[in-house]
Amino acid sequence: MNRIDIEGYTPDEILDLPDEQLDALALSGEPLVFRAGTAEILAEFKVRGESLIVELAQIDGGGEGVLPTLTSLIHRYATRRGLKRVEWIVHALNCAEPNLKLRRVMERRGFQITDVEGVGKAYYQVHEIGFF
């Protein structure tokens, strides 16, 4: 797999940032737009209890392995923080221009269409840290 940079940084470089800096960038409580490889992603990250909530609202472009790169980075971050699980919420159901490839990827990876409280219908999956 090709190396996928996120805003010009490798996943290792991102994880090398001090916790305070990384938390300020990613856990601001606001939606965040960033580039990963050739994809532009609109996402929000938050910690609730022992879970890291990852909400992907839009992914434009990509296809070169962006999701596996993000998954690995996010799980490594959650492990470092001592969190017990990662909850994935992916809004790929009601897009004006649906990404059919993304839908196939979500289904192949075992995501289920769920009515998520406060969100509505979305692809949803919980990964227990150490069991994914």
Segments (PLM) and residue ranges:
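Non-catalytic substrate-recognition and accessory regions of acyl/acetyltransferase enzymes
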Residues: 1-68, 72, 76-132
